[in-house]
Amino acid sequence: MKAGIHPEYVAITAKCSCGNVINTFSTMGKDLNLDVCSACHPFYTGKQKEVSSGGRVDKFNKRFGGLTAKK
């Protein structure tokens, strides 16, 4: 590697809107302000809502589930 062409790798702090502070390293060189981090994101906290969009079978049963075939 050539000397003097690579950016400096410095310590920065990433501050979340929930108050969590994460110390990390970056070549950007300035502190970050985050909207969401692993301490407040619903996926990581377990407060995630699972949405079932349903498939073709569910759609069919919703439309024709109560009907019976005549012989």
Curated annotation (Swiss-Prot):
PROSITE patterns cross-referenced by the UniProt entry: RIBOSOMAL_L31
Full protein name: Large ribosomal subunit protein bL31
GO cellular component terms, semicolon-separated: ribonucleoprotein complex; ribosome
Entries under InterPro entries matching the protein: Ribosomal_bL28/bL31-like_sf (IPR034704), Ribosomal_bL31 (IPR002150), Ribosomal_bL31_A (IPR027491), Ribosomal_bL31_sf (IPR042105)
UniProt binding sites for Zn(2+): C16, C18, C37, C40
GO terms, molecular function: metal ion binding; rRNA binding; structural constituent of ribosome
GO biological processes: translation
Cleaved signal peptide residues: none
Cofactor note: Binds 1 zinc ion per subunit.
UniProt entry keywords in alphabetical sequence: Metal-binding, Ribonucleoprotein, Ribosomal protein, RNA-binding, rRNA-binding, Zinc
Cofactor: Zn(2+)
Native organism: Aeromonas salmonicida (strain A449)
Gene3D superfamilies on file: Ribosomal protein L31
Quaternary structure and partners: Part of the 50S ribosomal subunit.
Family statement: Belongs to the bacterial ribosomal protein bL31 family. Type A subfamily.
